[in-house]
From Swiss-Prot:
<feature type="binding site">
    <location>
        <position position="78"/>
    </location>
    <ligand>
        <name>Mn(2+) 2</name>
    </ligand>
</feature>
<feature type="binding site">
    <location>
        <position position="7"/>
    </location>
    <ligand>
        <name>Mn(2+) 1</name>
    </ligand>
</feature>
<keyword id="KW-0464">Manganese</keyword>
<dbReference type="InterPro" id="IPR010138">
    <property type="entry name" value="UDP-diacylglucosamine_Hdrlase"/>
</dbReference>
<dbReference type="GO" id="GO:0008758">
    <property type="term" value="F:UDP-2,3-diacylglucosamine hydrolase activity"/>
</dbReference>
<dbReference type="GO" id="GO:0019897">
    <property type="term" value="C:extrinsic component of plasma membrane"/>
</dbReference>
<feature type="binding site">
    <location>
        <position position="194"/>
    </location>
    <ligand>
        <name>substrate</name>
    </ligand>
</feature>
<keyword id="KW-0443">Lipid metabolism</keyword>
<feature type="binding site">
    <location>
        <position position="9"/>
    </location>
    <ligand>
        <name>Mn(2+) 1</name>
    </ligand>
</feature>
<feature type="binding site">
    <location>
        <position position="159"/>
    </location>
    <ligand>
        <name>substrate</name>
    </ligand>
</feature>
<feature type="binding site">
    <location>
        <begin position="78"/>
        <end position="79"/>
    </location>
    <ligand>
        <name>substrate</name>
    </ligand>
</feature>
<keyword id="KW-0441">Lipid A biosynthesis</keyword>
<dbReference type="GO" id="GO:0009245">
    <property type="term" value="P:lipid A biosynthetic process"/>
</dbReference>
<feature type="binding site">
    <location>
        <position position="166"/>
    </location>
    <ligand>
        <name>substrate</name>
    </ligand>
</feature>
<protein>
    <recommendedName>
        <fullName>UDP-2,3-diacylglucosamine hydrolase</fullName>
        <ecNumber>3.6.1.54</ecNumber>
    </recommendedName>
</protein>
<comment type="similarity">
    <text>Belongs to the LpxH family.</text>
</comment>
<feature type="binding site">
    <location>
        <position position="163"/>
    </location>
    <ligand>
        <name>substrate</name>
    </ligand>
</feature>
Length: 240
């Protein structure tokens, strides 16, 4: 059995989500072969050199799960794309490229965070290209901590404002893009997060049935996708 989650947006200001996640790690996740976290694990991440005691505690909890033999994979999201190898070492997890094709219960599956699929949001896509540029990342990682914190607050506030102002379809995945993405990677299943719109979308690629599974975000409730010999099953659960 394999579990996939995304968009927890962990932060000290949401202890209810943190408690639910720690409970998830100590119970359901212990039964899994692997746990995949597909981005926006943290609400903000300004660098491994700026880890807070809160973030350190999350790393320890993940490491405890890895010591039980559960493989943990972490993918960058748009909020935490500066997570590096120092955190992954402390957490006992492996950083997973976006996109990645992995084997889930014998089937090749494409995993993505999902923000790169929202191509109608042209302003965000320009910002994404700028921030993910290797030179930009080098500069960001070498800014003083105070500057990084200020910049992170500014970007987060602007993101929230823009999300409220933009039309719903603009900040969602561009559906016409999906068949081509699946065909390019030679898979029939795509799993991603980012949009906070949990659902399974059936489609057709080269005359064959395919599907796009969107992971739910942890806010009013938690979400996890379970993959096993019976297929794919995603369901919400209470945070408390």
């Amino acid at each position: 059995m394999i579990l996939l989650i995304s968009d927890l947006h962990l932060e000290e200001e949401r202890p209810d989500i943190t408690r639910a996640f720690l409970h998830f790690l100590a119970t359901r996740a212990t039964q899994a072969e692997a746990l995949y976290i597909l981005g926006d694990f943290f609400e903000v991440w300004i660098g491994d050199d700026a880890m807070t005691p809160f973030q350190e505690s999350i790393a320890r909890a993940l490491h405890a799960l890895s010591e039980r033999g559960v493989r943990i994979y972490l993918m960058h999201g748009n909020r935490d794309f500066m997570i590096g190898q120092t955190f992954c070492h402390k957490a006992g997890c492996k950083l997973l490229a976006d996109p990645s094709v992995v084997q889930l219960c014998g089937e090749p599956v494409l995993l993505m965070h999902g923000d790169s699929l929202c191509t109608r949001d042209e302003g965000y896509m320009r910002l994404r290209r700028l921030l993910r540029n290797p030179l930009s990342l080098f500069v960001l990682r070498n800014l003083p901590l105070a500057t990084r914190r200020k910049l992170a607050r500014k970007l987060r506030n602007e993101s929230r404002t823009q999300t409220r102002m933009k039309a719903s379809d603009i900040i969602d995945v561009t559906p016409e893009l999906i068949p081509g993405v699946l065909a390019e990677h030679r898979v029939r299943t795509l799993i991603h997060g980012h949009t906070h719109r949990p659902a399974t979308h059936d489609l057709e690629v080269d005359g064959q049935p395919a599907k796009r599974i969107v992971l739910g975000d942890w806010d009013r409730q938690g979400w996890a996708l379970q993959v096993d010999e019976n297929g794919y099953h995603q369901a919400p659960f209470a945070l408390s």
